[in-house]
């Protein structure tokens, strides 16, 4: 949610800011702005809408070597130009961008800022006026005023501050919100995501919570809020420009759907050796073995991936698995087992709700494993252990390859632990072979894009509602399938356990209601699901049947190549991803950037 980019150095800041903000578009936003200063001149440009509108406003009129930019996803205040970032202080001297939520902004306003002319509706405006207040009223330097403000401000935040009277410095601070420093030659940068700086640098420095950084073109100094200097090394990010381009694809989502066979094979080469033996950290295996119950905490698509792997983990390890929604557990953690272990699933590794749970787990001394796509992310740094899903950058807001990669990564973990436990079922489960078959199954489904597109046009082009139904693992897939369809096509969609239809949901079925049924696993489950299909068809529904090879009947719509039952949630989800894609495309919507959504949810 939101994105920050900043640069100080000897280069054209405007171009870098615009390019950086474009790389952060995938995070989600409704307004944007930049501030550039240099040669005793400065300019602030803001707009509601896309980055292109900022670019059009800028033209050739803005130049300078220091600047900050921001994409905003509204939390406090409507998406207006006035509420867009950057924000200025009352005198215009100080300029600030902010991600996060200032929880005590009303208290700050009433205590310190009663004489200040606050124009907007945002909590960010409070922060910049507070800094100016301490400079003017307490006669503090900018650095000391910023520190004093940081001691008072409560909540989650990532700040980048410029004093227009000192165009050679950006002041940065963070707490519970992602922010990085990019190190260049003769310039340095600030960003929410390494993606924003991929053209300029591959060397980065982490900022930890409640740290302040003084960024100049030739130096970076990290301090705590009391002014103590902290030594901090840098690291090199493994990103490539080719990874973040669309190439010949019209949308990132379609590209990322197509990349899933490659991701499966990448995971095989990462978590298994040439002999097919598991290559999972022995410390992780031991920690899982010592747990009497595993708790998978996640949100959105990652939550569904946890469900998709639950049965497999339990059968291969003999360890019970419980799923939890991170946003609920952060406030209301249930009674835990005697030896719990937390597994946190997050594509970005920055999900604020999951981090809230992780902080509590660490306080309680509970071991934790983060499964993420981003090395060095907050959840990765703060968990006891990390496993990477190696999906490559996922730009589209609607997650696809991260879901399948999370399920596959959990499969490697489950097999490794099961083998260590001496479980025969785990030893007999040839994961390398079976996941190779999954990759082939995905490729076969991807070759049927035209067929799926035609089915979507017949079924979903004008509907306002739709339902997915399934049993067993297929039910878990329907949850993810429904989320995909609703978030990018805006069709109100729900995924249900097929057996629950008659307990209430069937009352919503009427003429031409689309019902998409998933059938895999075995003939007994298939027969029951087909019975449910007949129930809705007899009440006027239009049914589309996605069925695994070997269970198909004449008239079924999409046949998915058979895979091992433990991995069917991967192969069965692929046609539903394409259904969502084509439903959005055929409705003329922005597939990659659905309204109101953010890629990384970094506020609670």
UniProtKB/Swiss-Prot annotation:
Q: What sequence ranges are listed for the domain SIS?
A: 284-423, 456-594
Q: Does the keyword Repeat apply?
A: yes
Q: Give the record's GO biological process terms.
A: carbohydrate metabolic process; fructose 6-phosphate metabolic process; protein N-linked glycosylation; UDP-N-acetylglucosamine metabolic process
Name the Gene3D superfamilies on file: Glucose-6-phosphate isomerase like protein, domain 1, Glutamine Phosphoribosylpyrophosphate, subunit 1, domain 1
Q: How does it assemble?
A: Homodimer.
Gene Ontology terms, MF aspect: carbohydrate derivative binding; glutamine-fructose-6-phosphate transaminase (isomerizing) activity
Q: Which reaction does it catalyse?
A: D-fructose 6-phosphate + L-glutamine = D-glucosamine 6-phosphate + L-glutamate
InterPro entries linked: GATase_2_dom, GFAT, GFAT_N, GlmS/AgaS_SIS, GlmS/FrlB_SIS, Ntn_hydrolases_N, SIS_dom, SIS_dom_sf
Name the residues annotated as catalytic in the UniProt entry.
2 (nucleophile), 599 (for fru-6p isomerization activity)
Keyword line: Aminotransferase, Cytoplasm, Glutamine amidotransferase, Repeat, Transferase
Name any GO cellular component annotation: cytosol
User: Per the database record, which ranges form the Glutamine amidotransferase type-2 domain?
Assistant: 2-218
Q: What is its EC number?
A: 2.6.1.16
SUPFAM superfamilies named among the record's database cross-references: N-terminal nucleophile aminohydrolases (Ntn hydrolases), SIS domain
Protein name per UniProt:
Glutamine--fructose-6-phosphate aminotransferase [isomerizing]
Q: Which residues form a coiled coil?
A: none
Q: Where in the cell is it found?
A: Cytoplasm
Function of this protein?
Catalyzes the first step in hexosamine metabolism, converting fructose-6P into glucosamine-6P using glutamine as a nitrogen source.
Kindly indicate whether the keyword Ubl conjugation belongs to this entry: no
């Amino acid at each position: 949610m939101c994105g920050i980019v900043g640069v100080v150095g000897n280069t054209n800041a405007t171009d870098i800011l615009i390019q950086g903000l474009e790389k952060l578009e995938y995070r989600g936003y409704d307004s944007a702005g930049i501030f550039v200063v240099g040669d005793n001149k400065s300019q602030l440009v803001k707009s509601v809408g896309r980055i292109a509108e900022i670019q059009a406003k800028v033209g050739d009129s803005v130049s300078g070597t220091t600047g900050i930019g921001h994409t905003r996803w509204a939390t406090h205040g409507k998406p207006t130009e006035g509420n867009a970032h950057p924000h200025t202080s009352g005198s215009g001297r100080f300029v600030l961008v902010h991600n996060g939520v200032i929880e005590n902004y009303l208290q700050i306003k009433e205590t310190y800022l009663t004489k200040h002319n606050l124009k907007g509706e945002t909590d960010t405006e409070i922060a910049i006026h507070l800094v100016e207040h301490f400079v003017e009223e307490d006669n503090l330097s900018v650095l000391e005023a910023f520190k004093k403000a940081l001691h008072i401000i409560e909540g989650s935040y990532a700040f980048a501050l410029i004093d227009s009277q000192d165009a050679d410095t950006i002041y940065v601070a963070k707490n519970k919100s992602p922010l990085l420093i990019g190190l260049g030659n003769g310039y340095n940068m600030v960003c929410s995501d390494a993606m924003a700086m991929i053209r300029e640098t591959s060397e980065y420095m982490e900022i930890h919570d409640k740290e302040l950084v003084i960024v100049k073109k030739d130096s970076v100094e990290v301090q705590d809020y009391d002014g103590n200097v902290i030594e901090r090394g840098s690291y090199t990010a493994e990103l490539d420009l080719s990874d973040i381009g669309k190439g010949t694809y019209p949308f990132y989502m379609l590209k990322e759907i197509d990349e899933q066979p490659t991701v499966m094979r990448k995971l095989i080469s990462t978590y298994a050796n040439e002999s097919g033996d598991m290559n999972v950290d022995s410390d992780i295996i031991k920690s899982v073995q010592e747990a009497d119950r595993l708790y998978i905490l996640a949100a959105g698509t990652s939550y569904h991936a946890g469900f998709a792997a639950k049965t497999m983990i339990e059968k291969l390890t003999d360890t019970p698995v419980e799923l939890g929604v991170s946003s609920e557990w952060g406030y209301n953690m249930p009674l835990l087992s005697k030896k719990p272990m937390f597994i946190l699933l997050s594509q970005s590794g920055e999900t604020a709700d999951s981090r809230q749970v992780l902080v509590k787990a660490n306080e309680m001394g509970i071991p934790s494993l983060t499964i993420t796509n981003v090395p060095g992310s907050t959840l990765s740094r703060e968990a006891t252990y990390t496993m990477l899903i190696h999906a490559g950058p996922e730009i589209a807001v609607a997650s696809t390859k991260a879901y399948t990669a999370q399920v596959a990564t959990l499969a490697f973990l489950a097999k490794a632990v099961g083998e260590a436990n001496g479980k025969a079922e785990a030893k007999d489960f040839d994961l390398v072979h079976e996941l190779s078959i999954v990759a082939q199954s995905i490729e076969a489904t991807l070759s049927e894009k035209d067929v799926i597109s035609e089915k979507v046009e017949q079924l979903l082009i004008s509907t306002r509602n739709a339902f997915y139904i399934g049993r067993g693992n297929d039910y878990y897939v329907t949850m993810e399938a429904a989320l995909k369809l609703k978030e990018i096509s805006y069709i109100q969609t729900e995924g249900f356990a097929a057996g629950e239809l008659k307990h209430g949901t069937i009352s919503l079925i009427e003429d031409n209601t689309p019902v998409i049924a998933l059938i895999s696993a075995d003939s007994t489950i298939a027969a029951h699901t087909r019975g449910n299909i007949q129930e809705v068809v007899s009440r006027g529904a239009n049914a589309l049947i996605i069925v695994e090879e070997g269970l198909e009947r004449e008239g079924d719509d999409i046949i998915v190549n058979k895979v091992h039952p433990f991995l069917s949630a991967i192969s069965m989800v692929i046609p539903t991803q394409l259904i969502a894609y084509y439903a959005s495309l055929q409705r003329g919507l922005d597939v990659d950037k659905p309204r109101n959504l953010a890629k990384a949810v970094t506020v609670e």
